[in-house]
Design a protein with these regions (language model features):
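Metal-dependent polysaccharide deacetylase catalytic core of the NodB/CE4 family, i.e.
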Residues: 116, 120-122, 128, 132-136, ...
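Short, composition-biased local secondary-structure segments
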Residues: 160-177, 197, 253-271, 325-327
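Short, intrinsically disordered/low-complexity patches at protein termini
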Residues: 267-269, 329-330, 364, 372
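Charged/polar, solvent-exposed surface patches and flexible loops
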Residues: 51, 83, 87, 94, ...
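Active-site-adjacent pocket scaffolds in enzyme catalytic domains
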Residues: 20-47, 291, 296-334
Length: 372
């Protein structure tokens, strides 16, 4: 198996891979079954878990030089990469065990796994036969998981010099890793949009679906809305939703001299104008914040709210449907978590309805925003 993994790693390094700025996506039409039951969700989940575990195992055969080459970086933080890999393996094992609970209904991709060693063994020999019912999915999935893994490894390699959602700095920070199985939370960044815009459509759509989400607003955008439409209109916009803060401007809060004022001004504005919707959460743009900021957030009673599943809907290289397909693939892989969209992007008008339709019969839950 070691020899096979070595050659797999060599092919990864020598083969053409997408540029770091091109996010991974997976055409879900290559998967031959609709997710019309919890059991079929589990079948697809087991497949994505094993495919990603195989990619993760292959990456561990690369030495530091080869890993730098693969990630396109001159220096990398190996400690953070190792920590990320360990966390990923732990989540994969837990998720595979959860996905195995429906094997009595459909045994596809059900293998004997009683611990980490056996999971790694199954990942090492995981492959799809040429005559398999799932053969059309095999190669697109392999490419997706390699590219997605590289996204995550690259963030870990740069951490903490460039902070991101890949790691937590302390107890004042959270993501969705502790959420229950099959439970997801919707969040939207960088709004509100210009009037009228996607934010208006989105909050109305969510209310019609009897759903709620957390909107992380920018102070300057909220102020523009307030000046144009007034307090009552802004309150009506976010009726039934939760509103956190993302700072006054959409820029990194890790090296900005006025980062504290940015957060304080935005928090004061939201508390004053839409106090009933305010939740004490800060979402750092790009996930970038200072390593020593925990004391500030604690003093302000704020929790740093990160995410697990990035829709990458701001990327010009992804269409709305590709963004939704990326999210669904990662929902199958991680089985729970916080999903991050941007309500300033028109793509969400297509992506969110597509996602809800694709998962409507999968036995998933959408967490109320006040619980996040």
């Amino acid at each position: 198996m070691r020899i096979a993994l070595f050659f797999s790693a060599m092919l990864v390094c020598l083969g053409a891979v997408a540029a770091p700025n091109e996010p991974a996506t997976l055409d879900r039409s290559t998967w031959p079954e609709q997710l019309i039951s919890p059991a079929l969700f589990d079948v697809a989940s087991r497949a994505e878990i094993l495919a990603f575990a195989h990619a993760l195992l292959v990456s561990e055969t690369l030495d530091e030089s080869a890993l730098k080459q693969r990630l396109g970086l001159k220096t990398i933080n190996l400690d953070t990469i190792d920590n990320l890999r360990k966390r990923m393996w732990q989540r994969l094992l837990a998720n595979y065990n959860l996905a195995q609970q429906s094997c009595d209904q459909d045994a596809s991709f059900c293998y004997y796994v009683d611990g980490m060693d056996s999971l790694r063994e199954q990942a090492g020999k995981f492959e799809i036969a040429d005559d398999s019912f799932y053969v059309a999915w095999a190669e697109p999935s392999r490419e997706f998981h390699q590219r997605y893994l590289d996204e995550q490894l690259r963030k870990a390699a740069l951490f903490p010099q460039i902070s991101s959602e890949i790691e937590l700095f302390g107890e004042q920070e959270s993501n969705g890793e502790a959420m229950h199985d099959r439970l997801f939370s919707l969040t939207f960044d960088s709004g509100p949009s210009q009037l009228p815009g996607t934010t208006d459509w989105l909050t109305d759509y969510l209310r019609k679906q009897s759903m709620s989400a957390t909107f992380f607003v920018l102070g300057n955008s909220a102020q523009v809305r307030l000046d144009k439409s007034g307090t009552q209109a802004l309150q009506a916009l976010y009726k039934g939703q939760c509103v956190g803060v993302q700072g006054w401007e959409y820029r990194s809060h890790s090296h900005w001299q006025d980062w504290q004022d940015s957060i304080l001004r935005t928090t004061a504005l939201v508390k004053q104008v839409i106090p009933n919707n305010y939740v004490a959460l800060f979402r750092p743009p790009y996930g970038q914040r200072r390593a020593d900021s925990g004391g500030f957030f604690q003093a302000q009673g704020l929790q740093v709210s990160l995410w697990d599943i990035d829709a990458q809907d701001m990327s010009a290289s992804l269409s709305a449907e590709q963004s939704a397909q990326r999210v669904l693939s990662l929902m199958l892989l991680w089985r729970h978590g916080v999903i991050a969209f941007h309500d300033t992007q028109d793509k969400v008008r297509t992506a969110l309805p597509w996602l809800l339709k694709a998962t409507a019969q999968s036995g998933l839950g959408w967490e109320d925003c006040e619980v996040l």
